[in-house]
Amino acid sequence: SIDWEKWYRAYIDVSYDDDANNIHYHYNEDSSNQIRFTEKSHDDVTIPMKIKDSTILPKVKVKYVEKDSFDEFTSGEVTVNSDIVELPNDAPPQ
């Protein structure tokens, strides 16, 4: 779970690349479909994603914004290959 005393916000960043069809898709802070956690949201969140081509596996990482300094920390990236994604050991940062 996230230590909300330390972190202001956490973003889930989802991307996938399909070079053959020149598709590059990316969730980010400025998009309308941004996925964002704050202390008001629950730690256990299910995020539905529909991917048209099941041969393209999305990659997921989490970006944390520190409360005091607004410094950003980005976790390692994992490839989604099942319904449940285990984030790397560096997420959330201590």
Model regions: which residues?
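Extended low-complexity, serine/threonine- and proline-enriched intrinsically disordered segments
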Residues: I2-S31, V62-Y64
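Aromatic/hydrophobic beta-strand junction motif of beta-rich domains
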Residues: S1-I2, M49
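Intrinsic disorder/low-complexity signal
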Residues: I12, D17, N28, K52, ...
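Extracellular beta-sheet/turn segments enriched in Thr/Pro/Gly and aliphatic residues
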Residues: S75-Q94
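Short Pro-Gly-centered beta-turn/loop motif in secreted/extracellular proteins
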Residues: F37-F70
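Intrinsic-disorder/low-complexity loop/linker signature
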Residues: A20-N21, S31-N33, D53, E66-F73, ...
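A compositionally biased, intrinsically disordered/low-complexity signal enriched
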Residues: W7, V14-Y16, I35-F37, V45-I47, ...
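Solvent-exposed serine/threonine-rich low-complexity stretches and specific carbohydrate-binding patches
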Residues: N22-S41, V78-I84
